[in-house]
Amino acid sequence: MRNPLADKVVDIKPSGIRKFFDIVSEMQDAISLGVGEPDFDTPWHIRDEGIYSLEKGRTFYTSNAGLKDLRQEICNTIQRKQGVTYDWQHEVLVTVGGSEAIDIGLRAMCNPGDEVLIPQPSYVSYEPCAVLAGATPVIIDLKAENEFRLTAEELEAAITDKTKVLILPFPNNPTGAIMEKSDLEAIAKVIEEHDIFVMSDEIYSELTYKEKHVSIVSLPGMKERTIYINGFSKAYAMTGWRLGYCCGPAAIIQQMTKIHQFAIMCAPTTSQYAAVEALKNGDPDIEEMRTA
């Protein structure tokens, strides 16, 4: 019988962290430190909005890109917090968690043989997603003496003529490292010089403590070459709602939406209604959980 399996899938090792999580989830009174998950419940006003949407029978598909109200609130939030303007109609896509955005972003941008730069330690899904997209992951080992920040020199040394995308995972899981504005400015200069693209995973953007998070998309020339990824799991304790989003150049978002519409159709409708409430009225919840 022919082997029914694809080599590139078989060669990927299952996540060790998820294995530990599955084991702990079946144990009583165990505190799991295995995955990045807040130990708070989703705030009640957000849950109530999801419940209300069900009671009103809002259980149908949304548009592929997501609810209009949600995409508009995403744009309002980014403008308010990062000073960056996006077009809700053409530059925003609501996804099933930030993880889907990583997956379809790499698939939309990478051709076979393209290299994806991945600073590590970092989220376990980056490397497998690059492989599944047909790209070649190139690891940049971050150093403790640099507080696990990515330096311009490390980035420069890793770039080749095959480099297509840099994944920028800051604030970082698992190290907790953050990038200061001066760090990002140096990184941005290298990115522009080599004409590469950035996938900026900022899912932990609300969990900084000493200083306000700065996004690379807020720097001159970076919005045009960056896919900005964020979501609701960490900031609003909504991991199980499975909702994220990405913003970027319309041409890239259009191709990501194409993959999304064939593979997913749309993100969960109930979660989208709850997320509108989170963005509109959830800032006090973020602060309460962040400082608890």
Where do the model's predicted regions map?
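Conserved PLP-anchoring active-site segment centered on the Schiff-base-forming lysine
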Residues: 108-130
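A short helix-loop-beta submotif of the ANL/AMP-binding
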Residues: 131-138
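Helix C-cap/helix->beta junction micro-motif
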Residues: 27, 133, 193-194
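Structural scaffold positions in well-ordered secondary structure
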Residues: 33, 166, 201, 226-229, ...
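Active-site phosphate-binding strand-loop segment of PLP-dependent enzymes
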Residues: 138, 142-210
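Short acidic capping loops at alpha-helix termini that bridge into adjacent secondary structure
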Residues: 86-92, 112-115, 162, 223-226
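Conserved core segment of the aminotransferase class I/II
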Residues: 223-291
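N-terminal small-domain helix-loop-helix segment of the aminotransferase-like
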Residues: 5-97, 104, 278-281, 287
